[in-house]
């Protein structure tokens, strides 16, 4: 098969032997990728979305759908998720939903702010920013579960669990939703998942839950909550921030990291395309002073004294900026 991966340069295509980059006309970042049943490769970017399709020469050609949206004013709409629902392709930004039926595109501003979209079976769910969990019905978003019932945390993934659904939250672990009831899903690593912030999750064909975190790599957990394995920069991962996960037809796991890609052969070794070990993470900004330095990275804000980096307490996870204002150190942080 062929893998398609979005990155800062465009759409990457990997056939098992070689990589090929397909740029958008705007050369913007590709934030989201979805393969339609008709083979079209849908992609989302900043105020841009559309699809790649092969021509008669077997080359991928991009078709924009943005200009097909009528009576809609774009305003910083970045497409973070693409899925299908009720026979349509759905593109999601933090304030809008766009529906493509194969011919026309309709854009709507949502009353609440969708953080994501994810599909379990035939149902599409959507976590709302600072709100509860909704389902995407034919007539729009409908409230399903109040935020307080899910640990007052954002649901970042939903996966099949027996006859129900396992919802994984960013900071409060997992919850099983079945027959209208919600039960806590207990694991051997609940404390770690809550500490390191769950960001993505997929399920393998042998019902293993692969859970990616923002600051401590990947956990593999079975249905009973037993930890099967864990990978981070202390073992073999080159980066601890997991931005995407995918289980392929051979039951292998692909992880999109903040810096590079990891390929995990199930029950085997991990192979990397960018192998350097950097526990401090991907550096976004640096502030140098006389006797110390500060580094803002995807793992947090670090203070370096005598060549020893120390994570500043309370500023774990992604730190985007560090600067000095008078005698104060300012940090732009994901929190």
What feature does the model see in each segment?
Residues 1-335:
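Carboxylate-rich, polar loop motifs that coordinate divalent cations or form catalytic acidic clusters
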């Amino acid at each position: 098969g062929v893998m398609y991966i979005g990155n800062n340069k465009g759409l990457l295509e990997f056939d098992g032997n070689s990589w090929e980059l397909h740029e958008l006309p705007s050369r913007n970042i590709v934030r989201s990728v979805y393969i339609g049943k008709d083979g079209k490769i849908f992609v989302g970017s900043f105020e841009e979305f559309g699809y790649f399709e092969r021509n008669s020469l077997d080359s991928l050609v991009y078709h924009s759908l943005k200009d097909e949206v009528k009576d809609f004013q774009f305003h910083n709409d970045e497409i973070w998720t693409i899925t299908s629902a009720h026979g349509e392709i759905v593109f999601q930004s933090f304030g809008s939903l766009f529906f493509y039926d194969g011919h026309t595109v309709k854009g709507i501003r949502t009353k609440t702010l969708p953080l994501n979209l994810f599909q379990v079976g035939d149902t599409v769910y959507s976590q709302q920013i600072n709100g509860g969990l909704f389902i995407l019905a034919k007539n729009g978003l409908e409230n399903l579960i109040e935020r307080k019932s899910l640990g007052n945390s954002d649901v970042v993934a939903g996966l099949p669990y027996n006859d129900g659904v396992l919802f994984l939250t960013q900071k409060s672990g997992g919850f099983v939703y079945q027959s209208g009831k919600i039960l806590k899903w207990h694991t051997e690593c609940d404390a770690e998942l809550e500490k390191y912030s769950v960001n993505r999750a997929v399920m393998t064909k042998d019902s293993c839950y692969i859970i990616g975190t923002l600051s401590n790599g990947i956990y593999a957990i079975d249905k009973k909550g037993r930890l099967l394995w864990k990978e981070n920069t202390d073992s073999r991962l080159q980066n601890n921030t997991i931005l995407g996960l995918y289980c392929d037809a051979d039951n292998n796991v692909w992880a999109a990291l903040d810096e590079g890609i990891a390929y995990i052969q199930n029950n085997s070794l991990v192979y990397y395309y960018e192998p350097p070990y950097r526990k401090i993470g991907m550096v976004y900004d640096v502030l140098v002073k006389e006797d110390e330095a500060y580094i803002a990275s995807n793992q947090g804000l670090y203070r370096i004294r005598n060549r020893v980096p120390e994570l500043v307490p309370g500023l774990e996870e992604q730190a985007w900026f560090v600067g000095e204002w008078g005698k104060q150190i300012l940090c732009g942080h994901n929190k």
